[in-house]
Amino acid sequence: MKTVPTLSFSKLGCSRGGRQLFQNIDCVLESGHWLYVAGANGVGKTSLLRMVCGLAPIESGEIFWNGTPIHAQADAYRQDLCYLGHLNALQESMTVHENLAFTAALGGMAPDMAQTQSVLAHFGVAGRDRQLVRHLSQGQKRRVALSRLALSQARLWVLDEPFVAMDEAGVRMLADLIAAHLTQGGLAVLTSHQQVDIGAIPAQLLELRA
């Protein structure tokens, strides 16, 4: 049985080019909650998210997943994390199905064809699974990226400006997807320049200041 997931920061700090972006950040995020990382451009929001994803070194302090430093459980932590940014991060030379299967493999899962077809239909890209991503429109690519998020079994979602260039229907679709993830006991960390409404689930605010 899996433990109830918890993400925490202890005295977390980051600098860039000799300039301190943030320091002494303490935070605890528990199952069913989401963290809204706010702040002006250049204060380190993306740097913080990259540290949470393990893509940037932790300069000071520590990030814990279920009470253990993330660097001490890198493989297991990676399987429990799914990232979505303003870019879709899809392999253009692969089919939609291959992209989704690759993501499933990273999470230690085998792709479920019936579930994949159902999710693609839900996001309005049914019948596109054998199509090369390069032949999709930008809107279709974004919906494939959302499908990948929906199919993920990861308990921690890290979302960097996920609503950029999305129409109203897409924004609502993603917000509902995040809300469902939280209701099922997941966690989310996100940053956005747009107003974010995740249903009845209030944000836990972390505001970074220059």
Curated annotation (Swiss-Prot):
A Pfam family assignment: ABC_tran
GO molecular function: ABC-type heme transporter activity; ATP binding; ATP hydrolysis activity
Keywords attached to this entry: ATP-binding, Cell inner membrane, Cell membrane, Cytochrome c-type biogenesis, Membrane, Nucleotide-binding, Translocase, Transport
Gene Ontology CC terms, in alphabetical order: plasma membrane
Membrane topology: Peripheral membrane protein
Database matches in NCBIfam families: ccmA, PRK13538.1
Quaternary context: The complex is composed of two ATP-binding proteins (CcmA) and two transmembrane proteins (CcmB).
Domain of life: Bacteria
Binding site for ATP: G39, A40, N41, G42, V43, G44, K45, T46
Keyword check for Flavoprotein: no
Reaction equation(s) it catalyzes: heme b(in) + ATP + H2O = heme b(out) + ADP + phosphate + H(+)
Name recorded for this polypeptide: Cytochrome c biogenesis ATP-binding export protein CcmA
Record's function text: Part of the ABC transporter complex CcmAB involved in the biogenesis of c-type cytochromes; once thought to export heme, this seems not to be the case, but its exact role is uncertain. Responsible for energy coupling to the transport system.
PANTHER family cross-referenced by the UniProt entry: ABC TRANSPORTER I FAMILY MEMBER 1
Main location: membrane
GO BP annotations listed: cytochrome complex assembly
Family indicated by similarity: Belongs to the ABC transporter superfamily. CcmA exporter (TC 3.A.1.107) family.
Enzyme Commission identifier(s): 7.6.2.5
Domain ABC transporter: start-end pairs: 4-208
Presence of the UniProt keyword Heme in the record: no
Subcellular location: Cell inner membrane
InterPro entries given in the database record: AAA+_ATPase (IPR003593), ABC_transporter-like_ATP-bd (IPR003439), ABC_transporter-like_CS (IPR017871), ABC_transptr_haem_export_CcmA (IPR005895), P-loop_NTPase (IPR027417)
